[in-house]
Amino acid sequence: MEQLFNDLQQQIAKEMGSTLSLIDEDCGQLEALAGGEDRYPVTFPCVLIGIPETLWDNLASNLQHGKTTVTVRLAFDCYDDTHYGSTQEQHAAERMALSRRLNGCLHGWRFEGCATVLVRRASRQFSLPGGIKIYETEYATTVAEEIQNSES
């Protein structure tokens, strides 16, 4: 699983590194920031990666396949006035284009240790207090893991 996380970070950095300020594991930084905490500082735009669930099936005594969910959150601090006629309307479109570009570098990619390519399953947009806009995409893949049992 750690290889998948590292590979995701590297792929995003390779394809989009110059446009992002931070690529990190999602540890609730945005929710903490929205709650007034600065314990997990973030800079924007950022991508936060989570692997919230894997459902495992046994293939052999020490080999399992897992159906894995990956969440990728692209976040911006939005201080632009993007209402129609503001002359800054393009900023909203630029954020959406960056989200599409992020999906383009992940969807269909086969990462090391994965039995299937990463496939986009769902996406949504939402805002948090403080002018934070989040473009969240959920992906699915299948990973293989060999269990290393320690014998006594």
Where are these regions (language model features)?
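Small/polar-rich, solvent-exposed N-terminal microdomains that initiate assembly or binding
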Residues: M1-N62, A115, S150-S152
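Short C-terminal domain-edge/linker segments immediately following a structured domain
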Residues: D77-Y84, R101-H107
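Short histidine-centered catalytic/ligand-binding loop motif
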Residues: T82-E94
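Acidic-leaning, charged glycine-interspersed low-complexity segments
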Residues: S18-I23, L30, V42-L48, H91-I147
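Short, charged, solvent-exposed linker or helix-capping segments at domain edges/interfaces
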Residues: H83-S86, Q148-S152
